[in-house]
Regions:
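Rossmann-fold cofactor-recognition segment
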Residues: 38-53
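Amphipathic terminal alpha-helices
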Residues: 280-293
Length: 293
């Protein structure tokens, strides 16, 4: 299979490309990894996905069988002021990929976010719940989803949350560094979600390539917690002698509104290709053990 990975230099894009290179994921070996695949890695410096003519030209030249879109503008606060940049990356780019993929009959896997929801509920969101984004980031990601639905027939939209991995910057690495350097950290306790190991998500995205179970998916670590609880577990598993204190969202204001409760239920994975996301504590433990070596 000829596969294009966009956003290939990001933490998820690199995780996926590494899986193809070594022939297995941290969770096993999806069937497609046993095949001989032609993997193309592209990032913003090689292709601006907001330019439709460039995207179509590449797709018509290379004739990809599938595209995994990991490209996004994920600085949630900066999206509030850089709205055009956010729109180009998170909405226009996915639209262009959908148009180009449809022209050549390619599958499109697109990574989205829990921020498409209002975050004011008390039970986990399922894939068919109504979207109501509260931030510029959430709005642009939602628009990206809608464009894909409009222009593609062979799509997988996979919403994830609280992603961390071996590559690039992320919350887990940041908290470990702060705890080591300062011996204390203060973290919000009234925002609830699902910590997700990029290795788990990569495994599931690769599995989707072998199916035609198109639609919207949720892909997150099993179980939910607050950022405060997440940080306490990070510090504890890392064996760092540091104090973790709770604070409220009101005590820690940010330019972009965060969802108070955005826990996702992986209903589609559970009922179609199979849900193998690890409990978030288990996945975090493995990550920290591997990352400390």
């Amino acid at each position: 299979m000829k596969i294009l990975i966009t956003g290939a230099k990001g933490q998820l894009g690199r995780e996926i490309s590494e899986c193809f290179e070594r022939g297995y994921t941290e969770l096993g070996c999806p069937a497609i990894l046993k095949e001989k695949n032609d993997i193309h890695l592209i990032d913003i410096d090689e292709l601006d996905i907001s330019k439709l003519s460039d995207v179509i030209a590449l797709f018509e030249k290379e004739r990809f069988d599938a595209v995994i879109n990991c490209a996004a503008f994920t600085n949630v606060n900066l999206c509030e002021t850089e709205r055009e940049l956010a729109f180009r990356a998170n909405a226009l780019g996915p639209r262009n990929l959908a148009i180009a993929a449809e022209k050549i009959g390619a599958k499109l896997i697109h990574v989205s976010t829990d921020y498409v929801f209002a975050g004011n509920g008390s039970t986990p969101y399922v894939e068919w719940d109504a979207c109501e984004p509260q931030s510029a980031y959430g709005h642009t990601k939602y628009l990206g989803e809608e464009y894909i639905k409009q222009f593609s027939t062979k799509y997988f939209i996979v919403r994830t949350a609280w992603l961390y991995g071996y590559y690039g910057k992320n919350f887990v690495k940041t908290m470990i560094n702060i705890a080591k350097e300062k011996g204390a950290c203060k973290v919000v306790c009234d925002q609830i979600g699902n910590p997700t190991n990029a290795a788990d998500l990569a495994h599931h995205l690769i599995k989707l390539l072998d199916t035609e179970e198109y639609g919207v998916y949720h892909g997150t670590g099993e179980g939910e917690c607050s950022w405060y609880e997440f940080t306490k577990e990070i510090v504890s598993l890392s064996g760092i002698n540091a104090t973790v204190s709770p604070c409220t969202t009101d005590e820690y204001p940010t330019p972009a509104k965060r969802p108070a409760y955005s826990s996702l239920e992986n209903m589609m994975f559970k009922t179609t290709v199979g849900n193998e996301f690890r409990p978030w504590r288990e996945a975090l433990k493995v990550f920290i053990e591997n990352n400390s070596n």
